[in-house]
Regions:
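Short, glycine-biased loop/turn motifs at secondary-structure junctions and
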Residues: 1-110, 115, 123-168
């Protein structure tokens, strides 16, 4: 799918799901990186609406660009000190390590099953959705905050981990 088609298809899907007028008017003609930036900036909308689908992401986005932006779908993920935002969609498995002064917002979705190891002075915010399973290890002065969205996800912790259930 060409850049213009991909952007137009995603815009039309988003509008049909209730994208606000401001985002619609400011959409522009983004390339894949621009579309990924929109996805990460509007992650709450995307998660709530199931948009775009995992199949769509896998079929239309370059895996290297997704990985550079810490977005994974149905993959084994072994990473250390990911920055900013990380999104694990579908059936991801793996281990994420955070140490030193690293910070990250992580979204673990669908049927993903990951271990997240936070140590030293890291600060990690973890959102768990759907049927995802997380095992979270905290040590040292690491600050770890877990937000549980739904009744079907599983969160296991070891160490000082703050947990909250989503109000939505």
């Amino acid at each position: 799918m060409k850049k213009e088609e991909l952007s137009r298809t995603l815009l039309n899907q988003a509008v049909s799901l209730g994208l606000c007028a401001q985002w619609t008017e400011q959409w522009g003609e983004p390339d894949q990186q621009g579309l990924i930036d929109k996805y990460l900036h509007g992650i709450d909308f995307c998660i709530e609406k199931g948009y775009p689908t995992n199949t769509f992401i896998k079929e239309h986005f370059d895996k290297d660009i997704l990985h550079r932006n810490n977005i994974f779908v149905d993959e084994d993920v072994q990473a250390r000190n990911m920055k900013h935002i990380a999104v694990l969609n579908g059936n991801c498995k793996g281990t994420l390590l955070f140490d030193g002064f690293s910070t990250c917002d992580i979204y673990v979705r669908h049927d993903s099953d990951v271990t997240i190891d936070c140590s030293k002075f890291s600060k990690v915010f973890i959102n768990v959705y759907d049927r995802a399973k997380t095992h979270i290890l905290q040590s040292g002065a690491a600050s770890v905050y877990v937000y549980i969205h739904g009744e079907d996800c599983i969160v296991e912790t070891d160490g000082d981990v703050m947990q909250r259930k989503s109000q939505m």
